[in-house]
Amino acid sequence: MLIRVLPGDPILSIVPETATEEDIERTRIRYGLDRPIFIQYFDYMSGVFRGDFGTSIQTNRAVVEQIRERLPRTLELVLYGFIFSLLLSIFLGFLSAYKAGKMSDHFSRFVVLVGNSLPDFWFALVLILIFFGLLDWAPPPIGRIESDIGLELFTGFLTLDALISGNWRALGSALSHLALPVLTLGIVGAAPMMRSVRASALEVMGSPAYHCANAHGINSKELFWKYLFRESLVPLPVLAGLIFGNLIGGSVLVEYVFSWQGFGQWALRGLLLRDYPVIQAFVLVTAGFYVIIFLIADIVQAFLDPRIRY
């Protein structure tokens, strides 16, 4: 509802300049925008329960079809970015805790500072300038794969589809196009998780139980994996779930910079053009992902911390 109180009429962006008032009104009736907003809301929600998210005002295509087309592109990017972010934050968090006050600690905290301070779209532009413009190590930031490579789509995840079909050239091209946007999302997302891992690890290392286990001469590897690692990761699942959800919504500008043509870029275009069905679908799908993500986070939390029972 909130998007509809903003200035601007989506109908005016699709009718020709020569359209009369009658033409505009007929188009408005065609998309159901002439009815009271509460009736529009209940009609839309009844359609959602049937799997119908409406028709895009701008493209006149079913929104569900566009979601199927665009969502896998964003999920592939966000999933790889999240995995890289999670691994980076765990590695730097424990490294910083073990080397507290030393050069490694300062370097890890500098990475956190950079990740917290830089806007993701600006960081993406810097990476493009360095790795594509100056070093020529990365492909042009246009799309997900080279235009002259053919690939049959099964899942919408280009890397997975390339593996299924055994198209190694397509796999290499897809990975090279993923490198910079994944690096962008990974570093930005790793900052808060790394800080959480570091703080938890320092707390565990300072606990009497850890000192007692260390004093009993337990092997350093066993001490790390059975005591420090698991206990330090207890607070991480909820924060990681929040970061994953933020990456889905926050990938909009990164997709725009890299011409990714994903779910986020599709939603941004819908927002700029006041395409109500597109915006509403983006909000609902994103909210649904948050519910699923936090459900998974709660399950992982219960596995890491036996004190939690549901």
Specify the residue positions occupied by each region the protein language model found:
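Hydrophobic alpha-helical transmembrane segments of membrane transport/permease proteins
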Residues: 1-42, 131-170
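Alpha-helical transmembrane segments of integral membrane proteins
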Residues: 71-104, 150-310
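An internal, D/E-rich "acidic patch" concept
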Residues: 12, 34-90
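Cytoplasmic-entry segments and transmembrane alpha-helices of multi-pass inner-membrane transporters
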Residues: 91-127
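Hydrophobic alpha-helical segments of integral membrane proteins
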Residues: 23, 27, 37-53, 63, ...
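Hydrophobic alpha-helical membrane-insertion segments
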Residues: 115-137, 239-244
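Alpha-helical transmembrane segments and their helix-entry boundary regions
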Residues: 13, 36, 105, 121, ...
